[in-house]
Amino acid sequence: MDQTCSLESFLNHVQKRDPHQTEFAQAVREVMTTLWPFLEQNPRYRHMSLLERLVEPERVIQFRVVWLDDKNQVQVNRAWRVQFNSAIGPYKGGMRFHPSVNLSILKFLGFEQTFKNALTTLPMGGGKGGSDFDPKGKSEGEVMRFCQALMTELYRHLGPDTDVPAGDIGVGGREVGFMAGMMRKLSNNSSCVFTGKGLSFGGSLIRPEATGYGLVYFTEAMLKRHGLGFEGMRVAVSGSGNVAQYAIEKAMAFGARVVTASDSSGTVVDESGFTPEKLARLCEIKASRDGRVADYAREFGLTYLEGQQPWSVPVDIALPCATQNELDVDAARVLIANGVKAVAEGANMPTTIEATDLFLEAGVLFAPGKAANAGGVATSGLEMAQNAARLSWKAEKVDARLHHIMLDIHHACVEYGGDNKHTNYVQGANIAGFVKVADAMLAQGVI
């Protein structure tokens, strides 16, 4: 494309290339809209078709996964691995198992992952993978057979210096273990390229907690910069999985009163706030095969909002930790009307573009996921470092490194985020991540 093309021309070009990939187009629009003024002031980043290369994955692998269920019936699923950008290191990003998974979602996640990984300052490129397989309601044997069948194709595309997957929605420590074990068997190599592994075979302490902890570390830094803090604040958390659970734990440790959790069926509201004991029980319920927050609400006699999200509950801080596009413009209006002071994304792109714009216009502090939830991949990078050195660090060391990385990410966002009075963290995160990747791509030539 012409280096003098407009933002809309560029976005139309992306849309025409993949007209049905709405999630990917949304992610590109969100990033490029904030980048464009910076690009106009720094035209060297328009050379050598850098932007066109940046929005095109280096490689997309699509394949079928054939496996046997418990009834000995043949099942067929689709799987993908999007190896988006390796300019600053091996592809790094999770594997997602969910019926909604498609190429558009994985491209959006891989695109976001590229900038997120760059923000950590660790040498990791961006990638993402997954399948439309649904682990819910499956037996452990079925999950194992699916994971092993998937790896018979995927293993040939992975390696510690090539592509290092991890977990995501539907992929926890159990699934990572099954995939890493099959990878070891097929490759005849014990390097176990996955991160998020069990502690018994190369995993890192604090890795399960890292995304939730990192979210709270980043949010606390953002609040402190603007004269606020978690202490005494009412907090709404969406989701009840790994990220939500550890975000609740760390927010409580910082003195917040967390009043909600949710799942796809509804929201539990606890006006007195979570306690460590209540959170432990929620984690137990969610770890069971069919555990729902409705069960938790009944057990403790709490308010349950069936089919609703948490955003109607008046709070000071909102932490969306469930899934993409869960917080739309209508929910944003309600939060703003109820006096929300800060929103920080624990999930990947949980806030729609329109809702994000509304928060920024209203002066609400807003932390985008590529910065706020980078703690998970940052600690995966630390796991890779421990594996390479054949060492295992104590939890305190990993947590301290994670906290330091999140503060560094916050500093980078502030550096590129505009005026000192009210930092635009969306702009700051996008520009900071872009500059790191773009400089590496330009230095390596047209490849």
Swiss-Prot record:
It holds the Pfam family ELFV_dehydrog. Keywords: NADP, Oxidoreductase. Substrate binds at residues 92, 113, 116, 167, 380. GO terms for molecular function: glutamate dehydrogenase (NADP+) activity. NADP(+) binds at residues 211, 242. The record marks 168 as: Important for catalysis. It comes from the Bacteria. The keyword S-adenosyl-L-methionine does not apply. The keyword Cytoplasm does not apply. The active site is at 128 (proton donor). InterPro entries: Aminoacid_DH-like_N_sf (IPR046346), Glu/Leu/Phe/Val/Trp_DH (IPR006095), Glu/Leu/Phe/Val/Trp_DH_C (IPR006096), Glu/Leu/Phe/Val/Trp_DH_dimer (IPR006097), Glu/Leu/Phe/Val_DH_AS (IPR033524), Glu_DH (IPR014362), Glu_Leu_Phe_Val_DH (IPR050724), NAD(P)-bd_dom_sf (IPR036291). GO terms for biological process: glutamate biosynthetic process. Belongs to the Glu/Leu/Phe/Val dehydrogenases family. Catalyzes the reversible oxidative deamination of glutamate to alpha-ketoglutarate and ammonia. Homohexamer. This is NADP-specific glutamate dehydrogenase. The lineage of its organism: Bacteria, Pseudomonadati, Pseudomonadota, Gammaproteobacteria, Enterobacterales.
